[in-house]
Each structure stands twice: as structure tokens, then as C-alpha cells.
Amino acid sequence: ETNTFAPSKTDYDDFVRGGAFPAMVRGADVLAMRDVNIPIGGFIRAMEGPRTELVPAIWAGATPAAHVTREAFERIAAEIVDAARGKDFDGVYLDLHGAMVCEHDDDGEGALLAALRAVVGPRVPIVASLDLHANVTRRMLESADALVAYRTYPHEDMAEAGERAAGLLKRLLTRGTRYHRAARRLPFLIPINGMCTMVEPARGTYGALARAESAQGVALSFAPGFPAADFPECGGVVWGYGDDARIEGVVADLTDYIVSREAQWVVPFLEPEEAVRQAQAIAARATKPVVIADTQDNPGGGGDSNTTGMLRALVKCEAQGAAIGLMVDGAAARAAHEAGAGHDITIALGGQSGVDGDAPFHATFRVEQLSDGYCRYDGPMMNGKETHAGPSARLSLGGVQIVVSTYKDQMLDRNLYRMAGVQPEEMKILVNKSSVHFRADFQPIAEAILVAKAPGPLRADPADFPWTRLAPGMRLRPLGPVFKTP
């Protein structure tokens, strides 16, 4: 998932480590992911059987950031394509994201699918699952026999998307011919926070999709897109597959359903201090924590998870019983480990990404607890995933607890707080560096959820990005200004 405005590129080592995703695995080791809530896990479970031989090549995913380096793309893509070269496969499945922009190619997944098609030929079906935030391109649609997107955000149905992809592949193998395909592109960009399927209008949109799919006997997908990739095919797409040309009408109807509700996709945001003041007022009469999304520094959208705007707001507002995480600062984590728990350290925390309006936070912090950064997710988003955030620590400043780590991980699972000794259920205010994924595990314990617009590389309002290459006429937000080529 490429944020072309983000400060840090994505290199090969980022894919090796994984971070937001499991670490890179090859060959038979891929099959061990069958029980993880990701598409490849659902696909494996759905395809297993005495008459099916699964031949995995490689699986790798990197925490979202800026452009994927050419070296990383070419090394990993070559492994995938070479694994299919000269083999007599019946079908090919890819677990993709769908919003990769490389240094040398705007459409990483399209390039990979096209290269695979050139190797396996026109008769071997290629099916891929995509993230809900995919920027679906013409090349992707033309190179694959079927693309299947998630339907939930937070992405609780990742494995289900893999199962749906397996079902389509089985049907393609049985019928021996491609389905009719139709696709429509939305005329406006949707803010990331507006895509949450736990609330309207996204919840109703995916309900309408499921009803149309069932009633018409077709396969439908809607990817609202990732509105932080500056290239002409950025944005939402509705597409589907059917036995005949009727699929054109089904796709057109769902697109009209979405566009007719354009005003509902508008999202309100709070300034940092305003968000903290509201949280304090709510928390004063609540028994559960108020959760604030520090959405513009979401590492799941290209942020480095080290901006300090929300920390400053918590301190300035003298918040009590507050926690913020993850603050990614390897130097601060090392200083905490060198000093030891119970000691004070005077450091410049975070603010290292050169984001406009952001700067390091200079203060003397108390080291409350140290951690090796190991965490196993128990929440519904990626239940069972193990992550290693590197040397980590819980620092305190007044009534604020700061969970500092060495490596990036989106604060989407309560155990990321617990690994540093914060019990999230006992806090009054939680500030999560996340946009929506945190809701899967935190909404059940939250008195209220607020969205703050502190400085960060993932602009919550797409119209705030300095676009140069969007499709002419694209509205930069729902009911917003129209993009004009500079």
C-alpha cells in the first residue's frame, strides 16, 4: 500500500521483516499460514483436499510506506514469475494488496499480473485477492481472470476474501472460459476514515453489494481505493464478473448507489487539542476509555508513527490516565534500556520524519517499564499474528504514558499496549496511531471514538495532498474541489 507522499521508501528488507504483516516465507513454509487471518490462509484452507496440490512460491508483505524500490519489486516478482515458468499449473492464485506504486512503475500489481500472464499463457486462470484499499487499474483487470476484494474495514474478512478467490478459481477451472467483466470508476476520492464498514455509508454500501451479488448470481467487488497515491488510476472502482453481459448493469447500479450518496462520504475531523478536550469531557463521566485516532500518522497508510502533535496536545491539556502508542523511536528505546526502569531520561522524542508542522518533543521522561517488543495479537483483525517491535519501553510524562518501540506496528491490537505494561481498559484516554483498523479490537472497550487531524504524512482529507498526476476531473474529496493538471 503505497503512499507516494510518505517520507520513507519500501525496500527489500521491509518485505523480509514484514512488520504489519507476517515475515517473508517461501515454499512449503507458506502453507503454515493457513490459520492466520490473511487471504492466503483462507485460500489454502478452501483449496486443501486429496485432488489438489498446492505449490507455494513466496509470500511477503511490507508495512505501508512510500514507493517500493525497483530492486525489491524485481527480486520478489522474479521469484513469483520464475516459479510459474515452464510448469503445467492448472491455475494461479496471488494474495495481493492492489495499491503498490514502485520507483519505476505506477502499477506494481498490474506489472506482476501482466508478467505472470505472459509466462502462463491465456488459458491458465489467474485469480487474485485484493485489499479494500486497492487502486484497481485497467492492467490489473485485463491481466487477471478474477480479482476479489475485502469487504470490511477493519479488515476482519481477509481470510474470507481468500476463500472467495478460491471459489472463483474452482468455478473458472470447471467452466474453462473467462467470465464477462465490467468495471466503473468513481468520480471522487474517499477519505480513509470514511471507508470504515462499521458505520455508514460504507456499511450500507457493502450490504447493497452482497444483496446484488446474491440476487443476480454474480461476483462483485468494490475497492474505495487508497487516496494517497499520486497517479492517474488512484481512486475507487466497482467491478464484477458474470455469465453474460448483464453484469454491466449490476456494476452500473452499484456505482450509482455509491455516487448518489456522495455527501454521506464526507468525514469531520478534530484538531489535536480539540480532540483531547472532548475526550477529557467524555471521560469525566465515563467508565470506559475514549479512543482518539491519530489518523495522519497511521503507519498502515505510510506514516512513520513518530509525529508528536497528539503527544503535545495531551501534555498541554494536562491529560490524566492517558496513553499513546506506538511512538517509533529506536534511539529513545535504546536510551530507556540503557537507563533502566525507574530512571529518568532527557531526550528529544519522535518528530524525525520531516513532516510539516511537526518536531521532536524535548522533555524528561520517567522510564516505567522495558520490553523486548514481542507481541502476539489476540484481537479480531490479525488474531494469532506475532510481531517483534524491537526494544521497546513505556515512558511517562505527567499523566501520559507513551509506548515507544524500535519498529513500526499499527496500534490495532490491545496487546501492543500490554506488551509495555499499559492496560488499555483501565485508561481514560487512548491515542492510537491508526485510522480505522484499531476499531476491531478497541471499539468494544471504547466509550467514544474521535478522529484527530494532527500533522502527519497520511492526509485525512485527500484534498490536502499536493496532487500532480490524478485523472483530470477527479474530485479531491466527496463534494470537493476538482483536480486540475498543474
State the predicted function of each range.
Residues N193-G399, V403, Y407:
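Hard-cation-handling environments
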Residues E1-G49:
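N-terminal amphipathic/basic leader segments beginning at the initiator methionine
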